[in-house]
Amino acid sequence: MENINYQILKRSEKKLLKLFFEYFKHVINAHETLNQLLCEDNLEKRKELIKTIYEMEDQSNRSEFKLINESIWTISKNSPLASHLRLTITIIMSSRDLERICDYANNLTKFIEHYLHLDIKIFNNLVTLHQSALNNLKKTFESLQDKEKPLTLQFENATKTIIEFEHQYRLVLTKYYETINKNEVTERIFLIDLVASVKHIERINDYCYNIIKSFLFIKNPEIFN
């Protein structure tokens, strides 16, 4: 009976992980689409990309609800062991992190849409920052699927990325600040909106860190004591 229950739990785990990684891919795709938007100079194509990202945000919400419901159902029907329960809870927590990461794609898109009348070149430095966060997101995805490399390596990388990104975005914002007309209200407002958008990008790295940390905890619950 114990072996049967273990097999059921492993099947449930496999199903949950499949849903989780499908959702993760969707979030990456949303940010890849955002990256295209930041680089696209054709106005009509930009409008199409904006519409696509908003639709992807709606799909993100549905995917998150589906994953959480499946996780709750797994807990209620299978009476999971401690290790299985830790994985299920981690998937729930990480799905919330992924939903927030997708939210940031949505929020950044709103920022770009609001300034659609401006030359796309004004977002050049934002492209660099976002590409950095997108690369970190992809590395996080790959590290969770790579059973050969220890997760501690990506945890160290995620920690390093957060520190490096702070230095990077300060340089970018300083450059923007030096180029604006301080007496022009619209330019000051743009800078404020830009700072908020940069912080959205920064949070992507924070949530990548959270996801790696959560999955590390499954393998070694004592690691952060």
UniProtKB/Swiss-Prot annotation:
Cite the InterPro entries for this sequence.
P_transport_PhoU, PhoU-like_sf, PhoU_dom
**Pfam families reported for this sequence:** PhoU
Task: Please list the GO biological process terms of this entry.
Answer: intracellular phosphate ion homeostasis; negative regulation of phosphate metabolic process
What protein name applies here? Uncharacterized protein MG409
Organism for this UniProt entry: Mycoplasma genitalium (strain ATCC 33530 / DSM 19775 / NCTC 10195 / G37)
